[in-house]
Amino acid sequence: MQDWLTLDRRPTLVFGAGGLGGASALSLAARGARVALIDVNQDNLDAVARAAKEAGHEIKTLAADLRTAEACRAAVDEAVGLTGAPQVFLHAVGRNVRKPVLDLEDEDWAETISLNLSSAYWLGQAVGRLMVERRYGRMIFVSSVSGLLAHPHHAPYAAAKGGMNQMFRVMAREWAPYGVTVNAVAPGYIETDLTKDYLDKGNNRESLESLVPAERLGRPEEVADAVTFLASDRARFITGQVLYVDGGRVLV
């Protein structure tokens, strides 16, 4: 039987080496993709590259700060030199500042919007141009349930993810005639460092799990599975969609 999730030697750019980006890079590499992983944090890059090597795969890495348009475009150019023109793109760059609206500083807003939304636009535009030229591409953004739900103390993050959801839909509409699909995965509460930091600050794990119909937190690998599906040709007729990987969180 043919493996419809194979990504044999497909040039793949993954931006963001944290929990979800790193897990997705490993999943894509395991399916045969030729992965370049880009992040500002060298320790994260090294950890994912080691994990890939231990599993018998290779992930090339590139350290880059993605807070300006010029830096994003330069990172794409350099990453293409590592893998070739991308057929798969994943944006998993982001941060969250948890503060009430009245306590937010200007830099909290600017930094969160820049990393979560502006970098998605700059990188998506640069990679999209290459995909449209070649009339093929699988583009995936990591959104969040916060793009739909009104979580207190999440205003910049929610604005960024909500904006991302509309932005990628426009990309999907414009690029569909060129064989480029554009989708997003929207995780709920996942076992990542961000969630660990939240719980370490005295928040109750059981109360968090009680908000999820599945009654548990998700795992990075479960988000990575959704990313891998959307990167494959099995998802060739799916575009402009948000795939919620949240154990039912948006249902309640």
Regions found by a protein language model. Name each.
Residues 124, 160, 168:
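Active-site helix of classical SDR
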Residues 3-36:
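Canonical Rossmann dinucleotide-binding motif of NAD(H)/NADP(H)-dependent dehydrogenases/reductases
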Residues 100-101, 105-113, 208:
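Substrate-binding pocket helix/loop in short-chain dehydrogenase/reductase
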Residues 1-3, 149, 228, 239-252:
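Short C-terminal tail/terminal secondary-structure segment
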Residues 129, 173-177, 236:
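Alpha-helical segment proximal to the catalytic Tyr-Lys
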Residues 144:
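Residue(s) in the substrate-gating loop at a strand-loop-helix junction
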Residues 184, 207-238, 247:
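C-terminal helical subdomain
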